[in-house]
Amino acid sequence: PVKAFSSGVDRTMSPLEAFRAIALSCVLQLQRNEVGAIAGTNPEYVHQARVAIRRLRSALKLFAPVLNERFIEVYSKYWQELSSSLGSARDWDVFLTETLAPLEEAFPGDPDLAVLRARGEEKKIKAQAQASVALTQRVYSQLLLAFSAALFRVTPPTIEAQGGASALSLRKFAARLLGKRAKMIE
């Protein structure tokens, strides 16, 4: 399983360039976990694929002020759908390993827990199969290709429409974002 790695963002980049670097690192993390997630032999591959998608979706939200509205509208939906397709497999894995397993240790031989384990394993197998299907569908391949190409074609909205965000340095853009987030938690 491949965990998130540095996106290579540096202070000389514009906010849009930083978004591209982050988005490409997310796509690469997703692709590096794809074969393992499809095989279904280690649930960590699905987990790391979901981490990549979650990071990408967060980047889309954070960098929205410097992205074209149509770009966000189109791709946010597709990444959400893919995340949902993988979610059930991860949820069942977590339930079986982190919730049910401690109960089985506390109550060894409990017949109800054995039934729950058997049903949970069945659900996990079905969910893993659905995740594998999602990653082998043509629509997934098309999403990767279209999104990667669109990353290099996306243009920021007009400066007036975005409140000058694309004209900011990455440092000032980040400071503005952090300021907004800080106000949300006050």
Which residues fall in each region the model found?
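Cationic, histidine-enriched alpha-helical/coil surfaces that engage anionic ligands
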Residues: 1-186
